[in-house]
Each structure stands twice: as C-alpha cells, then as structure tokens.
Amino acid sequence: MFLAIFSLIHVLTYQVKLDDYSRDWINRKQAGVTSILAGVVDLKYLTRLFPTPDRILRDSEFLREHRLSFYGSEIGQKVGQPLATFLGNGTTTNCEGYIDKISIISDGNTIGARIEGWAVDRATNEIPKMVVFANQGTVSGIGFSGRLRPDVEALYPGYLYAGWLGHATFLSGTELEAYISVGTENALCKLIDIHGD
C-alpha cells in the first residue's frame, strides 16, 4: 500500500513538472516568433525556432511579403498596423500588471527590446493571452502570456502562469506602451508607460 501511494505521488509530481516544462518550451518558441514579428534580432530566442537563426532572418522578408507562416496569422498581421485597429471596443483600466525587465537588444535610432512582465485581466479574472506593444500609435510588437510566476501566484492565487515575454521596437526618445485585451468586449487596458528616453 505504501509503495502504491509513493508511486502515485511520484507520478503526480512528475506530471506537474512536465506541464511546467511544456509551457516553458512553448513560451520559448513563442518568444522567437515575437522577435521575428517585431524585427528584433534576439538570438537567445531565435535559436529556439531554428538552429541557424541566420536562415530564419534571411527568409523572413519573403515570408512577410507573402504573408506566410506566422506572418499570415491574425496576430502577425497586426504588427506594423495602427493601434486603432485594436481599439474598436474602446479602452478600460480594469487590468493589473507590471513590466519586470526591459533588455535592449539593438540600439540606434530604432531600439529593439525584449520585454518581460505579468498581467491579469480583472474584468474576467483570467490571464490575457497576449500583450500588445505600441510606439507612436503603431503596433510595434507583441508578447505571449503563460510564463511561470510563483511571485504573482502568491499575491493573486490562481495566476501562476500570468507572466509574459515579448519583443518590440521603438524610436529613440519616444514612449513604448503595453496593452492587454480585457473583458468579453476586448477593450484595451494600458499596463504602463515602459520607456521614454
């Protein structure tokens, strides 16, 4: 009997760890996609998509022009479009979240960044699926939710996977904004002004 209980506990513990590993694997792949969509060359995550990132970067423009692969997705087509395309249902303040880290990947007139944080949709009490980054009224990148955040879970029980990671570009000296889609109406909620030189 003891052996059966011990085995069951071991199997359940392994399954929980496997779930965390699966989510992490997916998040790393998604981060590679956000890097390409934003035009930020983040080798740390591009290598998660393909072992030789140079090939992805070389073929990326062709894929974009012909709306192939992730460029053909609804989300992929939003990058570079006016933020107003997301504002059909207005704005709200019914969200919580924080930008934990901004890593500058490329500098110059146009800055490329990897951005990490967490967000919660208080209208539906759910974790948003993605974060939208905007610069001067244009969608300049996206991020995907699902990253493990025990610190957020401690404050907001039920939100263990409220973390997100994404990429965006912005012009030097301008502000980069982060939004999530909130509620059943999908109104945009501004998380925070995250950069201004």
Kindly label every feature range from the protein language model.
Residues 77-197:
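Basic, ligand-binding patches in group-transfer machinery
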Residues 12-114:
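Intrinsically disordered, polar/acidic, low-complexity terminal segments
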Residues 2-12:
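Signature aromatic-anchored transmembrane alpha helix within multi-pass, membrane-resident enzymes
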